[in-house]
A protein has these predicted regions:
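The feature marks proteins involved in alpha-glucan
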Residues: 1-65, 70-77, 84
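Residue-level detector of short, conserved catalytic/binding motifs and their immediate flanks
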Residues: 2, 120, 270
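Conserved alpha/beta catalytic core and glycan-binding cleft of carbohydrate-active enzymes
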Residues: 215-217, 232-311
Length: 311
């Protein structure tokens, strides 16, 4: 177990932080990082070799979205483990003829009611359900049964928990120092500074990490609309226009384009999916013609209309 003990010259702040790049973390509510080096041997070569045809945009997608903490319980007080899910979940998806499963965020997070959308351990599968190699086995089993794996990924904001990324070295290292751009009023969380190269590199390396080390077939990027607009959930006087006088977050847009160009050029057969709830143009058009570069976009209107109909 370890943490970084930081004594900053900024206001003489002393703090202890979890490692932002830790591969494994203590089970919440504990917050230390854990030295970990798994030696998992993948058995999904057939899927990976043929993924480019199975996971392409001209193929049908039937996606089952799942929150691992509430899908099933081993008993009333115990989560099912990644290893349990490798049996029960795979069998269920096959019986229901789903082509893909989308995991709501499985990166480490401190607060259960957030459903995983407020991350502190971007490089670590949450220890709630087991070890990193156990999650790899779950992905492996899904691939061996021709089921693609999409991960919810949250580059839009992060929580203010003391051990997390916020005010990391006594300064706004990851978040934008301007609260009009660096604080999310809805979620009471911090917003990444997309204009800082080191922050962009952190996030893009994290996307690459999950696609590479965990064989993810796609990333569903959360809360894209909140990234695109400077006035998202802000009243007049609470935001500052960009250099052109409008409400688009040019730094975030540039980051999203760079992200999509990077992952599509680095990994064959993957897809990125935008959860974008407005009418922003060209979300799933190529960057080369001015688009954001996503492969797909959630049809948010259909989702809300369908849920309203059933409820």
């Amino acid at each position: 177990l370890y943490k970084y003990k930081i004594h900053s010259h900024n206001n003489n702040i002393k703090t202890e932080k979890a490692d932002p790049f830790a591969r494994y973390c203590q089970h919440p509510p504990n917050t230390a990082s854990v030295v970990w080096d798994d030696a998992y041997k993948w058995k999904d070569k057939t899927w990976m070799d043929t993924r480019e045809t199975k996971n392409s945009l001209d193929k049908p997608y039937s996606v089952y979205e799942i929150h691992l903490g509430s899908w099933k319980r081993a008993n009333e007080d115990k989560f099912m483990s990644y290893l349990d899910l490798a049996e029960d979940l795979v069998q269920y998806l096959k019986e229901m003829n789903f082509t893909h499963v989308e995991f709501m965020p499985i990166m480490e997070y401190p607060y259960d009611p957030s459903w995983g959308y407020q991350l502190t351990g971007y490089f670590a599968p949450t220890s709630r359900f087991g070890k990193p190699e156990d999650f790899k086995l779950l992905v492996d089993k899904l691939h061996q049964n021709d089921i693609g794996v999409i991960l919810d990924w949250v580059p839009s904001h992060f929580p203010e928990d003391a051990h997390g990324l916020g005010f990391f070295d006594g300064s706004c290292l990851y978040e934008n120092p301007d609260r009009r751009k660096g604080y999310h009023p809805d979620w009471k969380s911090l917003i990444f500074n997309y204009g800082r190269n080191e922050v962009r590199a952190f996030l893009i390396s994290n996307a690459n990490f999950w696609l590479d080390q965990f064989h993810a077939d796609g990333l569903r990027v959360d809360a894209v609309a909140s990234m695109l607009y400077l006035d998202y959930s802000r009243e007049e006087g609470e935001w500052e226009p960009n250099i052109y006088g409008n409400n688009e977050n040019l730094e975030a847009i540039s980051f999203i384009r760079e992200l999509n160009q990077e992952v599509y050029s680095s990994f064959k057969g993957i897809q990125t999916i935008a959860e974008e709830s407005t009418s922003f143009s060209m979300v799933s058009k190529p960057v080369s013609i001015g688009g954001l570069g996503f492969g797909m976009k959630w049809m948010m209107g259909w989702m809300h209309d369908t849920l309203e109909y059933f409820m």
